[in-house]
Amino acid sequence: MAAGTTSDLRNGIVIRYNNDLYQVVEFQHVAPGNWRAFVRMKLKSLTTGKVIEDRVRAGAEIDIVRIERRPMQYLYREGDSFIFMDNDTFDQIPVSADLVGDAVRFMKENETVDLVYDAEKDTIIGVELPIFVNLKVVETTVAVRGDTATNVTKPATLETGAVIEVPAFINEGDVLKIDTRTGEYITRV
């Protein structure tokens, strides 16, 4: 854990704040007229996924947490755990469903994802997917002919079980490029 000040804040870094690990989503240095300067922060909890907003005095000490990303292959789900394999040592590592969180919507077996570790404690704090994944449509409704006056969307179930909105021309069996940050359809592959 490295001590720093609010001047060391950057988007994306992880800090220990109120006994929890948070990723800095956004920050802004504010210096109102004749008041003391402060830093407004938007932080995302790595344990709950909840986003909070808070402010601290400018120059205040913060604990910057060093994190590591290690590529791992997702193997399978076993009860309330997900089993990953280290690509270098071939060790199998169970990760609880709480730490995987929403990433499960777009995780396909045998795909490589990044496990995020707290480098000081060598503990897993989360799972990061690639920004884009290619997934197959296993179920969708048939588009109604002539219903193309506007951008019509319909629900489609992907091979991972996730349901997303797709354009009317998408059919079962199509492979789609999905943005894992937003869960939105990008293009047909």
UniProtKB/Swiss-Prot annotation:
Localization per Swiss-Prot or TrEMBL: Cytoplasm
SUPFAM superfamilies: Nucleic acid-binding proteins (SSF50249), Translation proteins SH3-like domain (SSF50104)
Any one GO molecular function term: translation elongation factor activity
UniProt-listed SMART domains: EFP, Elong-fact-P_C
Record has S-adenosyl-L-methionine as a keyword: no
The keyword Ubl conjugation appears for this protein: no
One Pfam family cited in the UniProt record for this chain: Elong-fact-P_C
Keywords of this entry: Cytoplasm, Elongation factor, Protein biosynthesis
Pathway the protein takes part in: Protein biosynthesis; polypeptide chain elongation
Coiled coil: none
HAMAP family: EF_P
PANTHER family recorded: ELONGATION FACTOR P, ELONGATION FACTOR P (EF-P) FAMILY PROTEIN
Protein name per the record: Elongation factor P
